[in-house]
Amino acid sequence: MTKAELDSIKILPLEDSWYRRVKEKLDGIAKPLDGLGKFEHLIAQIGAIEKTTRISIQKKAVLVMCADNGVVEEQVSQSGKEVTLAVAKAMGVNNSSVGKMAAVAGVDVIPVDIGIDTDEVIPGVLPRKVAKGTKNFAKEPAMTEEEVLKAIETGIQLVQQCHRDGYEILATGEMGIGNTTTSTAVAAALLDLEVEQVTGKGAGLTDEALKRKCRVIEEAIEKYSLRDADAFTILKTVGGLDIAGLTGVFIGAAIEQIPVVIDGVISAVAALLAETLCKGAVNYMIPSHKSRELAETAIMKNLHLDPVLDADMALGEGTGAVMMMSLLDVALGVYLQGASFANFEIEQYKRYEE
């Protein structure tokens, strides 16, 4: 993929008529109007994406992008990069947190080595390595233009393959030590936010280490003049291969017209990048949960998305998105199988203009 090819991608808008039809069917179910709350909008959105009132999200997968980040050299994380490889290995045998959740939720886990700093071929993990991790953005740009484009293209291609394999809804996940630093750097630069206001402790930092993390991010933003840069340049300079790959997943889902669930802050940053690079991609995105990471709130506000879950989660791997898939299944149970007012021989609730 070239930059010109990325810039030329056009996302088709959703058809309002399908959204309205699903909402009308929801209103005909024997329950209070909007009784399922936010889920009614999400169900109607999925219907508009699928262009049907007979919604199906039975075949599900979570794409987990695994990659290392050179900025870990700056001691911005409690753990070293060896943890990325260890967790990826666990994912390959469904022994990580997302694997256990996905087994309960009926979701297939597809872990992807898009940039782990290792020469190992990891059993159960798709080998799609663009590079063995990024460079330390405190010293030099994290990626080349070619690496970013390859990672985005990889994400798009993975979605296309999932579509061919019959998957009806996808979730996004990631694993990469240091990626709360990269994601916060991207969000702060892209949304022109104060670094201290959107930087969290990640997997656990002391107050002193948090200050160092903020300093590393702020210095990089200033060094590369990122507050005046475009989204692609920001991603290339302080982002990660996992973020770039997930950006491709969101773009690919919009191209293939498949609903895709956002997980926490790292995938939320990728969602923001996807919408910035390819306007309209957000219409195919389903928010899941409010992350403990501070930047996520600002991103959701910018995307005009409203996460359903508020459980103070910060686990990563796609776990929040997988939980959201379970809740969508439950809500769809009412939509697909719920009795109508006619079944009960009672009058349907009417909507009145407010």
What do these predicted regions represent?
Residues 2-354:
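N-terminal loops that bind phosphate or other acidic moieties
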